[in-house]
């Protein structure tokens, strides 16, 4: 027996209509954010933010936003489950959101279209006010004291030529300085 309760795959949280090349799945990003231990008072930075997935998932974690809050499920159409059950579950999830958290996120990307994409996705996700995003190359990046850096740089033949990749990784090595106070997670 097979019942599709979800409809669209659960890795789609409902906030990302558009993305850039080779985006990370929201669920994978959420798992990495968990490993990075982003909390309500964290400052999270993604110096190559692309469509903003790490920043948004960090905000969701820090603010206690339920991951499926902004999406619909196939089971919502089932007559066996009253519509009030879905409404009540969403209301409960909305009440659980920590709107007072000091969480902040900063995103940078060399591509101004990616910056705009991140802003749009964050707004759709309801966390736009917690993110600051600007166009900037990794070579200009300065570590923000006390921050958690999470980055998924373009890699391999899917995005860069070998020479470009080597140059990018060299810049990353010069600009990203992980420490106990400033952990860095690179995929």
What are these regions (language model features)?
Residues 24-142, 158, 164:
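Conserved S-adenosyl-L-methionine
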Residues 8-9, 96-101, 152:
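A short alpha-helix capping/helix-coil boundary motif
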Residues 5-7, 112, 155:
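Non-catalytic surface loops within mature trypsin-like serine protease
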Residues 137-187:
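C-terminal catalytic and target-recognition region of SAM-dependent MTase-like enzymes
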Residues 1-18:
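Non-catalytic substrate-recognition/targeting regions of SAM-dependent transferases
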Residues 8, 17, 31, 131-134, ...:
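Preference for short coil/turn "hinge" residues that link or interrupt alpha-helices
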Residues 21:
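Residue-level marker of regulatory loop/turn positions in helix-turn-helix DNA-binding domains and
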């Amino acid at each position: 027996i097979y019942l599709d309760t979800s409809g669209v795959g659960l890795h789609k949280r409902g906030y990302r209509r558009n993305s850039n090349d080779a985006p990370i799945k929201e669920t994978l990003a959420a798992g990495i954010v968990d490993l990075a231990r982003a909390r309500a008072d964290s400052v999270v930075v993604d110096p190559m933010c692309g469509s903003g997935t790490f920043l948004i998932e960090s905000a969701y974690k820090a603010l206690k936003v339920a991951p499926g809050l902004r999406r619909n499920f196939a089971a919502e159409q089932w007559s066996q489950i009253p519509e009030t059950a879905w409404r009540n579950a969403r209301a409960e999830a909305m009440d659980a959101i920590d709107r007072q958290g000091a969480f902040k996120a900063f995103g940078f990307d060399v591509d101004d279209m990616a910056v705009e994409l991140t802003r749009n996705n964050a707004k759709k996700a309801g966390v736009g006010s917690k993110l600051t995003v600007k166009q900037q190359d990794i070579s200009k990046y300065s570590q923000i004291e006390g921050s958690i850096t999470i980055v998924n740089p373009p890699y391999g033949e899917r995005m860069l030529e070998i020479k470009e990749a080597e140059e990018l990784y060299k810049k990353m090595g010069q600009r990203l300085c992980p420490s106990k106070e400033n952990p860095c997670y690179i995929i």
